Amino acid sequence: MADQKGPKYTPAAEKPRGRRKTAIGYVVSDKMQKTIVVELEDRKSHPLYGKIIRTTKKVKAHDENGEAGIGDRVSLMETRPLSATKRWRLVEILEKAK
């Protein structure tokens, strides 16, 4: 029988990527190169009084081709840190501003 040799190294088991967050919001600024500022809205019911409370936060997102403009409704996906404050990237423009 011939002596069979295996690979010189064992490839590391591929880890599945974690679920990435997605968000939909409106572009409020496009004055930076390849970056847009998107306002994300969250609505929650107050635990005691039941009133719907609107909270907003602004996030910076990477727009490689500079396609999005102010007022556009866009879809974002979380990604690795691209700069000190940029952690999202533009997936698609859902609706252009009128």
Curated annotation (Swiss-Prot):
- For the region Disordered, what residue ranges are annotated? 1-21
Q: Name one GO molecular function term.
A: structural constituent of ribosome
Chain residue numbers at which the record places covalent cross-link Isoglutamyl lysine isopeptide (Lys-Gln) (interchain with Q-Cter in protein Pup): K96
Q: Which CDD domains match?
A: Ribosomal_uS17
GO biological-process terms attached to the record: translation
Give one Pfam family, short name only.
Ribosomal_S17
UniProtKB keywords: Isopeptide bond, Ribonucleoprotein, Ribosomal protein, RNA-binding, rRNA-binding, Ubl conjugation
Cellular-component GO terms for this entry? cytosolic small ribosomal subunit
Spell out the subunit comment.
Part of the 30S ribosomal subunit.
Similarity comment: Belongs to the universal ribosomal protein uS17 family.
Q: What does this protein do?
A: One of the primary rRNA binding proteins, it binds specifically to the 5'-end of 16S ribosomal RNA.
> What name has this protein been given in UniProt?
Small ribosomal subunit protein uS17
Identify the species of origin.
Mycolicibacterium smegmatis (strain ATCC 700084 / mc(2)155) (Mycobacterium smegmatis)
